[in-house]
């Protein structure tokens, strides 16, 4: 695991965009896209590079981490619609090459297995972007999720539904269930890139990177992965015991070694 500490959230977004651009410029790439506030700066920077420098996403495809059960893709708050408005519609990534779990599937119990099979058929995910919750969750894998879990239906906590109610007309309109990639599914991506900033994420980052491997902190599953880059700002790094070493290692990173 490589931990990259930047001064500001803007620098975090630039570094993550650098990583994604490296993959895209090397050829056909399968991206794992996350929603939420953490990757927004990275998406904006990638869109700017497409607009101003011609960064080409025409050979890329993408898979989303999760989707609400019961919402059509056309709904403004479906994660498919959100990722289009936040990123896909601002670059030349074919929306037909962007896949999400089907929250309207006629066999919702089997949709997770179908989605995992679609990822495998595409050759797997090259680089997966991830946020992290204050409780260490990634995707909708809340504390207690099995570290080897697959894409499946999860029940939203009442607090999560209340938190998301601001995006809907009322809390009654917020779905009770989501389809989310499991921790085992996420771990099969070849490169995991976690994004976090702000003091509110400091304890979760410390638990994920330096704490015990535990279902209590789902993001700690990254400790078992062979290629993880955690890109955070100084505030999110404030609880890391080895922060000075991470800064030292980055300062002396060989010029030939990419993220």
UniProtKB/Swiss-Prot annotation:
PROSITE patterns: GLC_GALNAC_ISOMERASE
GO BP field: carbohydrate metabolic process; glucosamine catabolic process; N-acetylglucosamine catabolic process; N-acetylneuraminate catabolic process
Pfam families xrefs: Glucosamine_iso (PF01182)
Catalytic reactions of this protein: alpha-D-glucosamine 6-phosphate + H2O = beta-D-fructose 6-phosphate + NH4(+)
Residues at the catalytic site: 66, 135, 137, 142
EC number: 3.5.99.6
Keywords assigned: Carbohydrate metabolism, Hydrolase
InterPro entries in alphabetical order: Glc/Gal-6P_isomerase, Glucosamine6P_isomerase, Glucosamine6P_isomerase_CS, NagB/RpiA_transferase-like
Pathway(s): Amino-sugar metabolism; N-acetylneuraminate degradation; D-fructose 6-phosphate from N-acetylneuraminate: step 5/5
Gene Ontology cellular-component terms listed: cytoplasm
Molecular-function GO term, any one: identical protein binding
Top-rank lineage group of the source organism: Bacteria
Membership in a protein family: Belongs to the glucosamine/galactosamine-6-phosphate isomerase family. NagB subfamily.
NCBIfam families per record: nagB, PRK00443.1-4
Function: Catalyzes the reversible isomerization-deamination of glucosamine 6-phosphate (GlcN6P) to form fructose 6-phosphate (Fru6P) and ammonium ion.
Name the UniProt record assigns to this protein: Glucosamine-6-phosphate deaminase
Annotated organism of origin: Rhodococcus opacus (strain B4)
Taxonomic lineage of the native organism: Bacteria, Bacillati, Actinomycetota, Actinomycetes, Mycobacteriales
């Amino acid at each position: 695991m490589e931990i990259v500490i930047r001064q500001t959230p803007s620098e975090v977004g630039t570094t993550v965009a650098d990583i994604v651009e490296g993959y895209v410029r090397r050829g056909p790439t399968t991206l794992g896209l996350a929603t939420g506030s953490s990757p927004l700066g990275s998406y904006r920077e990638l869109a700017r590079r497409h607009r101003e420098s011609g960064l080409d996403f025409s050979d890329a495809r993408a898979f989303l981490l999760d989707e609400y059960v019961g919402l059509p893709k056309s709904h403004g708050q479906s994660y498919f619609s959100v990722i289009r408005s936040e990123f896909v519609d601002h670059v030349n990534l074919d929306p037909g090459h962007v896949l999400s779990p089907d929250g309207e599937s006629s066999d919702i119990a089997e949709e997770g297995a179908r989605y995992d099979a679609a990822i495998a058929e595409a050759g797997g995910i090259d680089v997966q972007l991830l946020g992290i919750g204050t409780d260490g969750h990634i995707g909708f894998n809340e504390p207690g999720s099995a570290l080897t879990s697959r894409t499946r239906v999860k029940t939203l906590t009442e607090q999560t539904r209340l938190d998301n109610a601001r995006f809907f007309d009322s809390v009654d309109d917020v779905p009770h269930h989501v389809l989310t990639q499991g921790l085992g599914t996420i771990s099969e991506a070849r490169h995991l890139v976690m994004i976090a900033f702000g003091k509110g994420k400091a304890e979760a980052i410390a638990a994920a990177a330096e704490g015990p491997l535990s279902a209590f902190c789902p993001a700690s599953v990254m400790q078992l992965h062979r290629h993880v880059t955690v890109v955070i700002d100084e505030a999110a790094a404030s609880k890391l015991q080895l922060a000075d070493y991470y800064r030292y290692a980055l300062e002396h990173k060989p010029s030939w070694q990419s993220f």
